[in-house]
From Swiss-Prot:
PANTHER family: METHIONINE--TRNA LIGASE, MITOCHONDRIAL, METHIONYL-TRNA SYNTHETASE. One of its GO terms (molecular function) is methionine-tRNA ligase activity. This is Methionine--tRNA ligase. It comes from Mycobacterium tuberculosis (strain ATCC 25618 / H37Rv). A motif ('HIGH' region) lies at residues 11-21. Coiled coil: none annotated. NCBIfam families: metG, PRK12267.1. The gene is metG. The keyword Protein biosynthesis applies.
Length: 519
């Protein structure tokens, strides 16, 4: 099988995870699951970035040791991913011993290339962004200096640090972007990066001496690595680096896809490839920067009190329901909005009505009238052949959308087919055909149910990456064995006469809790 290595960004565990984190994990998980079902050998890496001043300050404010806070909060992130059915192969933490070794080896390679030097740094630093800013990138607002880009407070910093010769990589980066147009996506982010790099790059401060929570610089333990050198290296660690002769590294590096938020595109599309070029390591194939998820159009924040807890949401509405909503509602790559009303509408309209009701009605008729066995169809009429052709052509379309990180379009294509299937079912009127004594009508009855069950089966196969548990239940109801669930099974028709289990509902309608009477 062809290897496929996909990663999420690693989150800062300085606070509790929110639905924005879940959005990235669910999207990346859907891609990983899709590739597995499409016969790829997938490695899926996620985790937490436990280093940096942000985590150290959060621990100091909480009055606990930094390592303890990082470990405790990382556990929360890992439990959230498990609760959302994220199928990662490794949950990395930047405090892991092998990650320290990987970070040090990357540093040594960049140093050996002559790209690291010691100098004094003075400038503005944002703890929240873990990033330096020059004067022109800041502004005074009510007596507080903030970054223009993110609106976060900055403090003046002066210390001796190591620098990376980022300025030497301007032309090499631009050449790579132009030679590899799919390296950065979507196009708006690619254009942003090219514009930024075209303006010329300054050398980058890559160590700190003002705190000690991080990976120590080789042979200079009074310095810790700038958090982004350490953090970005996690992608190499997850592939077995620094053992470049290992089977893991030779099989999975370079990464096929880094999935990140749009706010960290500069680190991934400018700094990271420059570090790798310096170290003589092949660059990842693609970086996709998704948009933000807002609450009713408003940015989520603790101060506003509108942060959505993804685990509580999944417990109330269902894990697969939340996964479907997040990937169906928002054009992936753009900013999107969450609301209670929108997710309930998707659950009741798309899942309960369009898919769940179609599966339930057709399978119930099979159970009641055909001894609970897959019907033996007659000759396909034009309407049957047209619907089957639409369903058969879905895999290629859906694959193209997933390869472009357009999961919303993949789901839209599947639901357009389900819309056609519901219209077909209504026009064919199997409930009327069932009552007829005509042999031709009975053949149409069996054929209609066969075609409906077959397109429901194909839909269930294709929604497995997004809704693995629910899709699995539908495939169970259709008598599909575990070895009949990869995408290779799309073209293998249901076998007439297959015994089916008693039908049960898969997607119940959501009814909001009613207040007690008299309230």
């Amino acid at each position: 099988m062809k290897p496929y290595y996909v990663t999420t960004a690693i989150a800062y565990p300085n606070a509790a995870p929110h639905v924005g984190h879940a959005y990235e994990y669910i999207a990346t998980d859907a891609i990983a699951r899709f590739k597995r079902l499409d016969r790829y050998d997938v490695r899926f890496l996620t985790g937490t970035d436990e280093h940096g001043l942000k985590v150290a300050q959060a621990a100091a404010a909480a009055g606990v040791p930094t390592a303890a806070l990082a470990r405790r909060n990382s556990d929360v992130f890992q439990r959230m991913q498990e609760a959302l059915n994220i199928s990662f192969d490794r949950f990395i933490r930047t405090t892991d011993a092998d990650h320290h070794e990987a970070s040090k080896e990357l540093w040594r390679r960049m140093s050996a290339a002559g790209d690291i030097y010691l100098d004094n740094y003075s400038g503005w630093y944002s703890v929240r962004d873990e990033r330096f800013f020059v004067e022109s990138e800041t502004q005074l607002v009510d007596g507080t200096r903030l970054t223009v880009e993110t609106g976060t407070p900055v403090t003046w910093t002066e210390e001796q640090t190591y620098f990376f010769r980022l300025s030497a990589y301007t032309d090499k980066l631009l050449a790579h972007y132009h030679a590899n147009p799919d390296f950065i996506a979507p196009e708006t982010r690619r254009n942003e990066v090219i514009s930024f790099v075209s303006g010329g790059l300054d050398d980058l401060s890559i160590s700190r001496t003002s705190f000690d929570w991080g990976v120590q610089v080789p042979e200079h333990p009074d310095h810790v690595m700038y958090v982004w050198v350490d953090a970005l290296t996690n992608y190499l660690t997850g592939a077995g680096f620094p053992d470049t002769d290992s089977e893991l590294f030779r099989r999975y590096w370079p990464a096929d896809l880094h999935m990140i938020g749009k706010d960290i595109i500069r680190f991934h599309a400018v700094y990271w490839p420059a570090f790798l070029m310096s170290a003589g390591i092949e660059l990842p194939r693609r970086i996709f920067a998704h948009g933000f998820l807002h609450n009713r159009g408003e940015k989520m924040s603790k101060s506003v009190g509108n942060i959505v807890d993804p685990v509580a949401l999944a417990e109330a509405l269902g894990v697969d329901q939340v996964r479907y909503f997040l990937l169906r509602e928002v054009p992936f790559g753009q900013d999107g909005s969450y609301s209670d009303e929108a997710i309930v509408t998707r659950i009741n309209t798309d899942l309960a009505n369009e898919l769940g009701n179609l599966a339930q009605r057709s399978l119930s008729m099979v159970a009641k009238n055909l001894d609970g066995r897959v019907p033996n169809p007659g000759e396909f009429a034009d309407a049957d052949a047209a619907l089957l052709a639409t369903a058969d052509g879905l895999l290629e379309r859906v694959r193209g959308h997933f390869d472009a990180q357009a999961m919303h379009l993949a789901l839209e294509a599947i639901w357009l087919m389900l819309g056609d299937a519901n219209k077909y079912f209504s026009v064919q009127q199997p409930w009327v055909l069932r009552k007829s004594e005509s042999e031709a009508d009975q053949a149409r009855f069996r054929t209609t149910l066969y075609v409906t069950c077959e397109v429901v089966r194909i839909a269930a196969l294709l929604i497995q990456p997004v809704m693995p548990e629910s899709a699995g239940k539908i495939l169970d109801l259709l008598g599909q064995a575990p070895n009949q669930r990869s995408f290779a099974a799309v073209g293998v028709r249901l076998t007439p006469g297959t015994a089916l289990p008693p039908p049960t509902g898969v997607f119940p309608r959501y009814q909001p809790p009613q207040p007690p009477e008299g309230k």
